[in-house]
């Protein structure tokens, strides 16, 4: 949680109780690696532990593009999955016993996965939700989320700068504010319709306050995120439950690992396939690297706020959706026309300490270098976002040398688009790892 101060050193003991969460995380990761295939294991590792470094570039890009990247970042959603799994396994046991089992396990999971502000928020809210009935009190969500924020900031006020905290609390605030109003519309309807409406309204509620923050920090808004979450979130919850059980069983009895992995692996492949199909749709995402996209987002929020304030007109929200879609197409077309009809546009992309320069003319583009030394900057994603928002085709990539600050973004770039020609500089071996780039 962004702790500050002078570092201190003491004698280490790998078997100490304080390192139990790390040992559990390592054991779970090793068991996943032994029981699952490379692709499925990488996804499950990201889902259960938040460890995304093993994910294939294309899979990670697809999940991010369609609005499913939150399943790879352990958060309150995963705590809810775990609490639901424990409740299902315990059945109709006494409420006190469920509370005594669930709360410690949820907090242990939080420590295993790194105790980020978002997961700590969920642990506090789940604990309050389970303890309140035992004390004869009603669980009040606004009180729970406020108390969670107070505890986190009392421990470390600098946590307010955490993107994880900002997105988590804004998403839950949206769910508390909007979701009950939307689910009420399906009251008295068919059970299947109510379930679909609950999933839709929860996703929409989570987006209403968090979307501006996500667009500001990550520069992307997935237009198909409502659809992707409706199709995949229930499946992800099943994969989480079956995957966690399979890993625990495989850790105890390694011979059963491959068998226990069969069903979760099928679910993982289904989620990745759906993400790949949705990513291939045109206009599946908006990229906030131009003034047109920013103006469009402001316009969308303005018309929906106007609809909420009007309180009249049965079809006003349908009209707002239509206007939002029409204005999106208009903004995208106007932005693309600038690159289709103008002369040569030279764009130095902001990749921190590195180089990435786009040359765009008449809808065609060449990219000179694609890399950054800053670990938090994905040069390939930045280039791909700009090309898609410009509606340009990448014809060629030119590498002037092979150091990471000029070439480490290529994998992410080619996970999202291809280039017909790649020009490699014929220079000394000291100018980076050419063999690694060619691979």
What would you call each of these model-derived segments?
Residues 24, 28, 39-43, 59, ...:
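Stable alpha-helical elements in mature extracytoplasmic
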Residues 101-107, 145-149, 318-327:
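Central hydrophobic cores of alpha-helical transmembrane segments
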Residues 76-96, 126-132, 172-182, 242-246, ...:
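Membrane-interfacial alpha-helical segments at the cytosolic side of multi-pass membrane proteins
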Residues 16, 191-193, 248-439:
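Non-globular, low-confidence helical/coil segments that flank catalytic cores
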Residues 115-301:
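Internal transmembrane alpha-helical bundles of multi-pass membrane proteins
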Residues 75, 210, 401:
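Conserved G/P- and acidic residue-centered "switch" motifs that form tight phosphate/ATP-binding loops
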Residues 1-123, 130, 396, 415:
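Aromatic-rich juxtamembrane segments at the membrane interface
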Residues 90-99, 133-143, 310-316:
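Membrane-helix interface "capping/anchor" motifs
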């Amino acid at each position: 949680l962004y702790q500050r101060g002078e570092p201190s050193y003491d004698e280490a003991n790998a078997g100490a109780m304080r390192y139990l969460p790390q040992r559990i995380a390592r054991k779970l990761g090793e068991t996943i690696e032994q029981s699952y295939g490379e692709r499925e294991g990488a996804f499950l590792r990201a889902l259960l532990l938040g460890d995304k470094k093993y994910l294939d570039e294309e899979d990670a890009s697809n999940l991010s593009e369609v609005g499913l990247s939150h399943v790879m970042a352990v958060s309150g959603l995963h705590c809810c999955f775990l609490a639901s799994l424990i409740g299902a396994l315990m059945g109709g046991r006494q409420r006190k016993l469920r509370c005594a089992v669930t709360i410690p396990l949820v907090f242990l999971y939080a420590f295993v996965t790194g105790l980020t502000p978002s997961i700590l928020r969920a642990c506090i809210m789940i604990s309050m939700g389970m303890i309140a009935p035992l004390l004869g009190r009603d669980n009040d969500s606004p009180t729970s989320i406020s108390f969670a924020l107070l505890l986190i900031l009392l421990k470390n006020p600098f946590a307010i700068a955490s993107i994880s905290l900002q997105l988590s609390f804004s998403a839950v605030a949206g769910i508390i504010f909007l979701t009950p109003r939307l689910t009420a519309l399906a009251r008295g309807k068919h059970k299947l319709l109510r379930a679909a409406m609950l999933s839709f309204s929860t996703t929409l509620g989570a987006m209403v306050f968090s979307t501006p923050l996500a667009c500001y920090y990550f520069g992307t808004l997935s237009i198909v995120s409502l659809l992707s979450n409706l199709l995949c979130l229930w499946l992800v919850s099943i994969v989480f439950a079956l995957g966690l059980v399979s890993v625990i069983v495989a850790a105890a009895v390694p011979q059963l690992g491959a068998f226990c992995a069969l069903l979760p692996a099928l679910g993982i492949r289904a989620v990745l396939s759906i993400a790949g199909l949705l990513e291939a749709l045109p206009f599946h995402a908006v990229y906030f690297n131009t003034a047109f996209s920013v103006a469009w987002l402001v316009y969308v929020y303005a018309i929906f706020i106007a609809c909420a304030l009007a309180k009249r007109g049965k079809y006003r929200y349908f009209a707002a959706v239509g206007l939002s879609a029409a204005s999106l197409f208009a903004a995208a077309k106007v932005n693309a026309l600038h690159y289709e009809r103008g002369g040569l546009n030279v764009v130095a992309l902001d990749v921190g300490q590195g180089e990435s320069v786009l040359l765009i003319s008449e809808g065609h583009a060449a990219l000179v270098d694609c890399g950054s030394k800053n670990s938090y900057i994905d040069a390939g994603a930045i280039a791909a976002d700009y090309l898609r928002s410009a509606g340009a085709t990448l014809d060629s990539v030119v590498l002037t040398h092979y150091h990471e600050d000029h070439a480490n973004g290529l994998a992410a770039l080619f996970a999202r688009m291809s280039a017909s020609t790649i020009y490699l500089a014929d220079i000394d071996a000291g100018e980076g790892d050419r063999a690694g780039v060619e691979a």
